[in-house]
């Protein structure tokens, strides 16, 4: 609400006190200063910390701009993405009487954020993540959203681990960007226009079949490299209901391999709007509990020449992404038998990986 004429960092307490004065003053007027019908209302909660939309931004090897966002730039070294509007707030907050609080420039689609915006151009061992990354002021108007900050932080954490692996500084990781991107995807991250090409994933070289499927939900979708709905492309395998004995998805490997892990990505219905709010009215509109689309119970069966050589049971799952540790066993076939979902009438699986 405030901060244009003050130092957002050094004058933090002063800004906070001014905001308290505005908030309680407006509430006093609503409750006591006119015919607003609020005489019997009580103020339930006021935040204690001013929310900083921006303060310091550090310069990296690339400065993300408004043009990059509006033109949906797809960088070769993308490690994060965003899609929020370019959201410009009135500089003087409540004191800008003639302006709307927010001037939001909407656009369709998403943009990517390059790795080069996450490390300092002149401090050789410094990464940034969150609202201090290398963007212009208008670039930050979109990238400042918490979800965007979060996935950038995950990318930086993974990048730091690779710097340790290769004994390099952040700028020196450029030759290993593909490895970083694949690390992000393996942990169920998403990067536009980047598919799973993990050389270690044996599923990519397998043939896939299922006990049933529907049009658009073919078994081969689980190894197409994309683990969520993108535009009109649905991308999962979807069973035609659930038979009494369950539904099976079978991956026939390109030979006999020792398999110790199978990763599965299910449908948690990303299209369902979840609003984190203190509003009781909004909370009452939210779906309570586990997403019904998620698979609940299933078995991962290792087979060699058609004979079972290992089985791992998973019960009560409530997560979208499962990394299932198996007893390392030589096999040439992986059967995953899905027994129950958390309520949905069919099974949906976006991705299967085999390691």
Language model features with spans:
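Generic short beta-strand segments
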Residues: 264-269, 339
